[in-house]
Amino acid sequence: MKLTCVFIIAVLILTACHFIVADDTGDREWRDLEWLRSLKAHDKRAGCCPTIMYKTGACRTNRCR
């Protein structure tokens, strides 16, 4: 019983911390993901690779100038 209570309290604390941290970083990660998707869409349309993706090796087409 004591172990169960400790586990539940730990989960609640971790969940609260996650939401406090995710409030800022999660939103930023989501924007970064959307930005990366738009870069990939741009890459397919233009036939060139944005510099940031070219450097990471995410695409093998010509780098955009």
Swiss-Prot record:
Its main location: secreted. Probable neurotoxin with unknown target. Possibly targets ion channels. Belongs to the conotoxin O1 superfamily. Contains 2 disulfide bonds. GO terms for cellular component: extracellular region. Expressed by the venom duct. It is found in: Secreted. Residues 23-65 form a propeptide. The cysteine framework is I (CC-C-C). Alpha9/4 pattern. It comes from the Eukaryota. Coiled coil: none annotated. Residues 1-22 form the signal peptide. GO terms for molecular function: ion channel regulator activity; toxin activity. This is Conotoxin Cal1.2. Keywords: Disulfide bond, Ion channel impairing toxin, Neurotoxin, Secreted, Signal, Toxin.
